[in-house]
A protein has these predicted regions:
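Short linear motifs embedded in intrinsically disordered, charge-biased segments
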Residues: 1-188
Length: 188
C-alpha cells in the first residue's frame, strides 16, 4: 500500500485507489525539482527555480563579485553553477510571457552584479552576455526543449509519452486567449 500526494483544488482530502494506495490532496508540491500546482502552469515553478538560482548566486558572490577575476571565467562559473540551476527541468514548461520576463529580469540583474555595471551605465544586457561569453536563459531553455523534443520524437508510437503528446482533450475552452501548448513553445 503506497502513500503519495496529488495536486487538486480540494486540499485536505484523501484519495484511495482500488489497489489501496492513498494520495493526500495538496494545492502544490515539488517533484524532481519542479513545482506542480493544482491550477497548472509554470509560474510557481519559475519562481522556485529563480529563488534557487539566487541562492546559488549568493553562495558564489564572493568570487563572482571580485574585480580581479576575468569576465570569461565568471561567465563559465555562472553558466555551470547558476544558470543550470535556473533552467533545471524547464524543457517541459509552456511558459507565458510573464514567466519568460521573470527569468530574463533575474538573469540580467545577476549579470550586472557580476560585471559591476548598473542600469545608469546604459550598457545593454546583450553586451553583458557578450562580455561574459554566455547565452541568454531563454536561448538555453529553447535549446534544451529541442533536445528533449528529439528524445520524444524518437520514442515508439505506442509509448505513453507519444500518446500524451498526441492527446486532444474534448470540451469547450474557457474565455480569453488559449493557453500556449508545449508544442507551440517548441515551434517558436
Amino acid at each position: 500500500m503506497g502513500v503519495g500526494v496529488v495536486a487538486v483544488e480540494e486540499v485536505g482530502k484523501e484519495i484511495v485507489m482500488k489497489d489501496g494506495s492513498k494520495f493526500e490532496c495538496v494545492s502544490k508540491f515539488c517533484y524532481l525539482g519542479d513545482m506542480l500546482t493544482a491550477a497548472g502552469g509554470v509560474a510557481e515553478a519559475s519562481i522556485v527555480r529563480t529563488r534557487c538560482a539566487w541562492k546559488q548566486f549568493q553562495n558564489l558572490i564572493s568570487f563572482l563579485g571580485k574585480r580581479g577575476v576575468s569576465l570569461k571565467l565568471k561567465g563559465k562559473l555562472y553558466r555551470s553553477s547558476v544558470q543550470s540551476v535556473m533552467v533545471y527541468a524547464s524543457e517541459t514548461w509552456a511558459m507565458k510571457v510573464g514567466d519568460e520576463q521573470r527569468l530574463e529580469r533575474n538573469e540580467n540583474a545577476m549579470l550586472r552584479w557580476m560585471c559591476g555595471v548598473s542600469k545608469k551605465d546604459r550598457i545593454s544586457s546583450k553586451e553583458l552576455r557578450d562580455r561574459l561569453s554566455i547565452e541568454g536563459v531563454l536561448e538555453v531553455i529553447k535549446r534544451s526543449r529541442l533536445r528533449w523534443f528529439g528524445h520524444v520524437e524518437r520514442k515508439e508510437k505506442d509509448d505513453w509519452v507519444s500518446a500524451c503528446r498526441e492527446l486532444e482533450v474534448d470540451g469547450v475552452r474557457g474565455r480569453g486567449r488559449p493557453m500556449k501548448t508545449w508544442r507551440e513553445c517548441v515551434n517558436t
